[in-house]
Amino acid sequence: MGQKTIIPFGPQHPVLPEPIHLDLVVEDEVVLEAVPQIGFIHRGLERLVRTKDYNQFIYVAERICGICAFGHSMGYAETIEKLMGVEIPKRAEYLRVIWHELSRIHSHILWLGLAADAFGHEALFMHCWRLRERVLDLFEKTTGGRVIFSVVKVGGVNRDIDRGTLDEFVRVLEGIKDEYNQICNAFLKDPSVYNRTAGVGVIPTEDALGLSMVGPFARASNVNYDVRMLGNGAYGDLSDFKLITSENCDCYARMEVRAAEVVQSIEIIEELAAKIPDGDIAVPVKGAPADGAEACNSLEQPRGECYYFAKGNGTKNLERMRMRTPTSQNLAGMAVALKGCDIADVNMIVLTIDPCISCTER
Amino acid sequence: MGYATKSPWVIHYDASSCNGCDIEVLAALCPGFDVERFGIINTGNPKHADIFLVTGSVNERNISVVKQIYDQMVEPKVVVACGTCACSGGIFHDCYNVIGGVDQAIPVDVYAPGCAVRPEAIIDGVVQALGILDEKSKALKAAKRGA
């Protein structure tokens, strides 16, 4: 038996694009405990709603996180629409969901790449990111931005996508599918990847429920919960929505779930692009939220359920805006998964929760 | 600048950015933009790095980390502030926890603007940084000879 040592992990670490600090209490090669410390990206955005107009804050909301940027602007806009009782046109709902699913594709492919980097497969990392560029090109073509889009506004969306471009969406995504399946083969069928990830960082279903984990991280532990199945907005018009879960509860299962969700998102976009109704893309929103009015809303972000709460005070500035982001839910699960793991597996486990520290700390 | 006398290695740190600039820094290193063709490699070790890419507006908590990474880098070194937040604080400039710009913490040589910064702007910034790196290393050598 060796003696206990504390190994600091982060905030600056090559596997993490974002800073989080973990104190790993280590005995020999085994991690006894992982203590996360956060605060490196805290900016205080929830305080900003008091000084910004509710229309202006949507641009701040979008910059809560650069990976789930579209999801945050959509979630915030939906919350304010509920707060003020605005009903948006059907076409705007469809466009929002199409973009949101597209951002899920880009986020999951990005994550697959980072995961490949974490288990030391750099060529796979590069292939994933090459594929992701083609998704970003679609974003750039329709919104003008690659990661920050500024396309959602309270009451609808700023830009329309015409028929030709929607057809191009479908064509490009169909083209991506083949290459994507090849990449997935490397992730899911390669024995070296399997040996590295299977049985690592197991969280049983009961623990996942007890720790209130969300998103693909929870679904990989066989928790059947996805906000999309509630059918908010254009999700309600889907002919079929099947939850993707896995029973393995380990790092391999998390990869499996995310890999399948990309294909699911492509199918959702294809279906909605065929069904999209004609009409306006926005309604004018006037006035201010009533004093004391409250609204809440939840949305399935690429990383899991994100919950929004807003309270008005009769002026154009909101009284309170609160978000509960998926990663803050999942950090507890990460600390549990790290207990008893090998020190070499730490970066793998940290990555499989798909940490988005910018969301968490705001 | 005709040719680069050195293949620079870069180190990247997210000092309270929204993540958008960070994934663009990584995207610049990946096949879409591929800065590796200029010999630029991302490293995790400050002692190996020549160019420090900082994103984000720096807050009270991570200012010490930014300073530490900068101090650990070996001379000559160049700092590139990537994104509007890193240049001036950007949209977060009036947040209570934000110091506002990387230049409040460490000396910055090149400012690459954009929200989020485009990979082209990062590449342009790094190419400018290469010129500055050359000058700094010449000055360093001259000082040694003089001493």
Where do the protein language model's features map onto the residues?
Chain B
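Iron-sulfur-associated redox domains of electron-transfer enzymes in respiratory
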Residues: M1-A147
